[in-house]
Each structure stands twice: as C-alpha cells, then as structure tokens.
C-alpha cells in the first residue's frame, strides 16, 4: 500500500539540559508543557482543535504514568482531546510521530500534537530487593519483640541504592549496557579511539557554530519556579578537542575499551513536539506546512549491536525510493555514541557485511558533510523520549535553512531496533 505523506505544520523543542548529579529543575511534563505552549501559541487554531496528543516518554515519573494525557490537559486542549503515551526506548519520540501518522492516514485524526519528553536527571533511585524484603518483614512485624528481631536483620548493604537509569540502559536479554554494545561495534569495524574522539569534538564544534548562527531557532526558552531562564542547550563544550577527549578513561570496558563519557551522548532533560496534519486539515485550516514525512521504517536486529539500527531502518527506505546515500541532501543520525554512528557508516561501506545482513552490495560512503550538520547528541544531549522527534524536527529546520529539499532521520534503539523517517520541505509550494 502506498504511503500517504503527512504534513509537518510546525515544531518546537526545549533546551536540552545536562543532568548534573541532581534532579533537574523540570519534570518531564513541565518540559513538554512549556515547549508546547510556545508552539501552540503561534498557531492559527485553538488547542481544542487537535484530534489527539501523543507523547513518547521512556522514564515518566510515578505520578505521570500516562504523561501524554497530563500534557494535553495542562496545555489547555480540553477534556475532549485524548492524550496517550508511547514507549520505544530511544525512539519513543519518533514512535509518537509514527503513531500520529497512522492515525492521520487511517482518517481517525487530522491534526495531532506529537513528540517526546524525558527528564533523565529525575530517573528513579530504587531500593534493592533485599531492602524491599526487609521493609515487608518490618511492616508485618507485630509487637516490640518481632520489631527488634527484624531490626537486627537490617544490614548496611540493604541501603545501597539501585540507580534506575543504569538498569534502564542495560539490555535484559543480552545482559549488555548500551555502552558495551557500542564497544562491540568499535571492535567489529576496527574503529580507533582517535576516530571516536575526533568525531565527538566535531559534534561540539558544529553545535557551537549552529548556536552562533541561530540554527536552533526551534528552541523555546524555559523558566523555572525561581524565574531562572534556560534559553539554549547547556551541554555543548567550547573547549572540546580530540586531545582533551583522549585524556578520558574508558567507562564500559576498562581499561582497554574505546567508549568514554566524552564520545558518548549526554544524559539530558528535554522535550520536542511537532504538529502533524492531513492534507484536508492543511486546506481547511489554511495551514502553512514546513515539510512532509514521506516514509517510515522500523527494523529489528541483534541487541548486542543495536547501534546499527539506522542502517537496517533507513536502507529499505532508500531502496523503495531508488535513492543512494548521497542522493539525500542531509542526514540526521542520532549520536548515541560516536562508535555507533561511525559503525553505521562503516557498515554501508562493507560489501561483505551488506550482502550478509541486507542482501545488497555495499551502498558506499556517506558524505559526512551531509551528516548532523549542526552537531548531534554527543554535544546536545539525548533525552531518550525526545531525541527521535528532535532529529526529525531539526532535519527539516536544517534543510530549510540551507534551501535544500530531502533528508533522512534515523535512530538506534536499545533492545536491538532501528527507526527512520524520510522527509522533505514544503518551502516554495503554493
């Protein structure tokens, strides 16, 4: 069945705020609501005109389990506008867009607010199983004697916290952390530490240049409860260089590994939202789209090499549209790790790998001047629920700023999946 394009009317994101060893100033819903208000205020329709609100979130707080509905209500969409939440790990925001696309294509919706949010700095700190069992025993103890006997069984090790974020970033099937899967890719494709650090420094340099040139005008500034303003991504480093990055020690494969904090994406809080519409809604509401989503693909692969997800997801789109890697004007590949992005590029160049895993000859060399032109998650950050929506939105913004036409946004997904979206701009169309 032919894919019916869906229009992107507008989009916005929050600044991406680096987690700094303490809960950040905003809950995940706060990030999305402030971003959404800025986005909806500039539209010609009322929030109540939306068909639905769909939000991707990987780590909602316990009091915001259906965070999509919470956000819809706090944005003033009214009781009648449904809101719901999706979760596909790192691609949760992209999944929200795809869910909106499917609702629009089937005729159930015609105007949808979709995207993602996460406040990873507020990821839960959990109790160990031993502590939970002890608390259950304490709660069931009757009388001073039982209480005292239970108290004697409490050990200091029971109080050791369990970091929820670390558990979430570890694959329960293969038992590897996301960083360890990146080490697998660096080893498989012979990626040197120097290459990873050089790529990472370039991500910061491109992000700095983008900030200086106003390339991130999709950002809506945030204000916290104290009145402090957050206007731009705060994890971009002016002093990043391959030489400084080379001093950092490996994190996931000590002491011989290649993956460090410096060549990995940052743990970040942030939100990104887009307004999607049908052709009929564009006409009836006299909307001015910024672009179209032309195709979507999801893929599954070995969780131990999950970082190759962009290759598995975007290649079928290229095949369907008879495109080569460099027939697209720009690419956004989410930078979970420098090793992961470079492994994707190496895989496309490897004829034996392509024939074994894709059933195709090598696709060739992607021109890196087309890739992540304003930096990526290594510099900007990776709020898991938001990143998939961010790369789609920024791809359209980057294309429009350069008067270009088509691009691909692709993302790897913990658990061994990949997602990709082919987009084009609408500038100059009547």
Language-model features, listed with the residues they occupy:
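Conserved beta-ketoacyl condensing-enzyme motif
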Residues: 24-143, 219-232, 304, 327-347
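Condensing-enzyme catalytic core mediating Claisen C-C bond formation in acyl metabolism
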Residues: 1-26, 153-168, 243-308, 312-315, ...
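Conserved catalytic cysteine-centered active-site region
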Residues: 26, 57-112, 122, 157-160, ...
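Active-site pocket-lining segment
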Residues: 183, 215, 294-297, 301-379
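Short, well-ordered amphipathic alpha-helical segments that serve as non-catalytic structural scaffolds
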Residues: 28-43, 67-71, 96-99, 178-185, ...
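Flexible glycine-/small-residue-enriched beta->alpha junction loops
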Residues: 111-184
């Amino acid at each position: 069945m032919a894919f019916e394009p869906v229009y992107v009317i507008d989009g916005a994101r929050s600044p991406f705020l680096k987690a700094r060893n303490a809960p950040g100033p905003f809950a995940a819903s706060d990030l999305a609501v402030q971003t959404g208000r800025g986005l909806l205020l500039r539209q010609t329709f009322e929030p109540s005109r939306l068909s639905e609100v769909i939000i991707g979130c990987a780590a909602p707080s316990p009091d915001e389990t259906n965070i999509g509905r919470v956000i819809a209500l706090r944005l003033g969409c009214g009781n009648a506008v449904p809101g719901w939440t999706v979760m596909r790990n790192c691609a949760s925001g992209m999944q929200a867009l795809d869910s909106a696309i499917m609702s629009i294509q089937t005729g159930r919706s015609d105007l949808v607010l979709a995207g993602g949010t996460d406040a990873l700095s507020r990821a839960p700190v959990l109790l160990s199983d031993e502590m939970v069992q002890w608390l259950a025993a304490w709660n069931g103890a009757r009388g001073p004697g039982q209480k005292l006997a239970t108290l004697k069984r409490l050990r200091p090790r029971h109080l050791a916290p369990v970091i929820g974020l670390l558990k979430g970033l570890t694959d329960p099937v293969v038992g590897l952390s996301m960083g360890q899967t990146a080490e697998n890719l660096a080893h498989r494709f012979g990626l040197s530490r120097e290459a990873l650090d050089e790529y990472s420094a370039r991500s910061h340099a491109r992000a700095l240049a983008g900030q200086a040139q106003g390339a991130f005008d999709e950002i809506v500034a945030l204000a916290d409860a104290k009145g402090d303003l957050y206007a731009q991504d705060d994890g971009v480093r002016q002093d990043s260089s391959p030489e400084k990055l080379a001093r950092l020690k490996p994190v996931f494969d000590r002491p011989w590994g290649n993956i460090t904090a410096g060549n990995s994406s940052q743990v970040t809080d942030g939100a990104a939202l887009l307004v999607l519409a049908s052709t009929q809604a564009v006409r009836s509401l006299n909307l001015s789209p910024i672009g179209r989503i032309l195709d979507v693909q999801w893929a599954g692969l070995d969780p131990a090499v999950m970082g190759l997800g962009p290759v598995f997801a975007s290649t079928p789109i290229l095949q369907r549209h008879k495109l080569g890697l460099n027939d697209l004007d720009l690419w956004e590949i989410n930078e979970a790790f420098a090793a992961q992005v470079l492994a994707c590029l190496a895989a496309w160049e490897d004829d034996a790998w392509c024939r074994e895993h894709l059933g195709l000859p090598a696709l060739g060399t992607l021109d890196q001047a087309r890739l992540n032109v304003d930096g990526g998650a290594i510099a900007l950050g990776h709020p898991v629920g938001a990143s998939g929506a961010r790369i789609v939105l920024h791809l359209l913004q980057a294309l429009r700023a350069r008067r270009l036409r088509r691009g691909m946004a692709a993302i790897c997904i913990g658990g061994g999946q990949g997602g990709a979206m082919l987009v084009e701009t609408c500038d100059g169309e009547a």
